[in-house]
Amino acid sequence: MNALNYDKSLHIETEEIQVGFHKSYHYHRYEPTPYEHLEQLFREFPLRETDYVVDFGCGKGRLNFYIHYVFQSTVKGVEINEDFYYQALLNLEQYAKSRKKKKEKIHFYLGRAEDFLVQPEDNYFYFFNPFSLPIFQKIISNIVYSLEQNSRKVNIILYFPSDEYRFFMDNHALFKKKGEVKVGNRTEKDMFIIYQSLY
């Protein structure tokens, strides 16, 4: 199923790509993960209904709705752009209405990703190269702090990862690479890399 058909089926609108760039060089432009790549990822690494997934730089919420639709997991999206945040909320209304589903397992937060308070139940964290390395490092520090307070296994999913993200995670003392899923053939970066905590 192509992106427009997926969006139509879920009664959401996530396809449009941001034109131009964010006013801060720390934050990158919005571009949703292709649905066919999500299908490939989760065929190899399926989720459970009991999982809690946080998408940093969620945009209009494509990943959130896809995961909820397929796995019924709890999903949280963090977005700094007000327009995208309100589009995600509109998508949530349409999605819930069309599928007669309750909304309590889908959440969106407006604000800086590095200010998001990681909760004890959060166990998957998704990044599509949404911001600069210093912000990514701060978020990983927040996740590690949460693990120190509430020990558990967590997974970091990187899509189209930058060399800086990869180097940082490959050399992090508290995470190990769990696997890779290659998708598409545009570039060698066209992949997902999954890291798991050693806790």
PLM region spans:
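C-terminal substrate-binding/active-site "lid" region of AdoMet-derived donor-dependent transferases
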Residues: 135-194
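Glycine-rich SAM-binding Motif I of class I
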Residues: 61-65
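Conserved short alpha-helix immediately C-terminal to the canonical SAM/SAH-binding motif I
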Residues: 84
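A short SAM/SAH-binding and catalytic strip from SAM-dependent methyltransferases
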Residues: 122-135
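Conserved class I S-adenosyl-L-methionine
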Residues: 50-59
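Conserved SAM-binding motif I beta-strand of class I
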Residues: 74-79
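S-adenosyl-L-methionine
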Residues: 1-49, 87-120
